[in-house]
């Protein structure tokens, strides 16, 4: 009798684990956005100095006026020239910056503390460390 109850409990437990997965199909719209491309390419070491358009492209459309460019360390962000904006695809955020020769820059595109980059359903983008180095003169 005890063996039958134990076996029945194990079977019910195993079935219950799979039932929620069958009832809820995965939908890309419910996933958090991720960075899929950067300009300059993350890790680049030959970015030209001076004015430059930095672009961050996400895996899905993003909410307008929603971003959080957090410095990765003290003074790690270049000087912004103007305000960030999204291109017409609503996936690519662009900001014009001024960069100094020979300097390494880094941002967190979202972070544990700041999560302004969000899709229209308010899913914050997965934090992404974006670093690059500017060429010497």
Annotated model-derived regions:
Residues 19-24:
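Sec/Tat signal peptide C-region and signal peptidase I cleavage site
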Residues 26-137:
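Acidic, low-complexity Ser/Thr/Gly/Pro-rich repeat segments typical of extracellular/periplasmic
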Residues 9-18:
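Bacterial N-terminal signal peptides
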Residues 1-8:
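Bacterial N-terminal signal peptides that target proteins for export
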């Amino acid at each position: 009798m005890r063996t039958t109850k134990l076996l029945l409990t194990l079977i019910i437990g195993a079935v219950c684990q799979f039932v929620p997965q069958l009832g809820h199909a995965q939908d890309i719209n419910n996933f958090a956005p991720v960075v899929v491309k950067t300009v300059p390419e993350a890790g680049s070491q030959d970015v030209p100095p001076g004015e430059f358009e930095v672009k961050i492209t996400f895996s899905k459309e993003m909410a307008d006026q929603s971003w959080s460019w957090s410095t990765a360390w003290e003074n790690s962000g270049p000087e912004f020239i103007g305000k960030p904006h999204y291109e017409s695809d609503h996936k690519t955020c662009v900001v014009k910056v001024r960069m100094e020769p020979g300097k390494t820059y880094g941002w967190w595109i979202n972070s544990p503390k700041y999560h302004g980059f969000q899709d229209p359903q308010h899913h914050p983008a997965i934090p992404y460390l974006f670093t690059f180095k500017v060429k010497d003169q």
